[in-house]
Amino acid sequence: MIRRPPRSTPKPSSAASDVYKRQVSIKTPITFATNMTAKINNEVYLKREDLQPVFSFKSRGAYNKIISLTPAQKKKGVIAASAGNHAQGVAFACKKLKIPCLIVMPVTTPDIKVRSVKNFGAKIILEGDSFNQAVKAALKIAKTKKIEFIHPFDDQYTIAGQGTIGQEILETDEEYDAIFLPVGGGGLLAGVSAWIAQHTKKVKIYGVEVEDSACLLEAIKFDKRVRLREVGLFADGVAVEQIGKNNFDVIKECVDGVITCLLYTSPSPRDATLSRMPSSA
């Protein structure tokens, strides 16, 4: 893909910056990856989103979506479906905002993840054997209870919240040639690429997918969103069958390319990362 000036891309609203005030999210550091740089002979930097209170970037988008709701919607509470990071992001944001929170998690979710979400005060419902089944259950409950469903990636406010990462990257003194972002449903890639594209043409943006879960690559091939028949589950955090609609609209305009990779094909850079990063990174 060739990056063009975005026609209509989400801008992190002034509300997005409020995530720092309530400490739902923090401005994370960018660290020089010494071992990985030596391994591949290129300077590599890591955006340390593992240092967030919920150990991932998901709290940014979740909070930005939730604060966009009306007072009446907030009073009723929200519901989300997730087996991990999104669940924690929504639950933590709701705790800070004192909003009722209901999370639907697949029955296969490890107990440790269920407990971590409960610790933020969310009510848990175990339903379905997969993420998609949990989503269907959550949407049904949302309709019955007339409460807002917080989508993990396919939402303009969520996308804009994730885009604050791009804002932080450009605030540093370092000049970067390219930014590489993992792709699941596309929320992170859409948000960061939108911000970068609006503020500079010097930095290339690439999405990175595992080959057996490459829903974005397939969408680009056919110039429309494609639902994968099956996805690999080793990298379960990015195992998504179909790229988000709002996400794909932004990505087509703002991203320079997509890279797919095989698991363990080149273990050395991975080993170099693991030797310097905590397991949650």
Residues of each region from the PLM?
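Right-handed beta-helix
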Residues: M1-I2
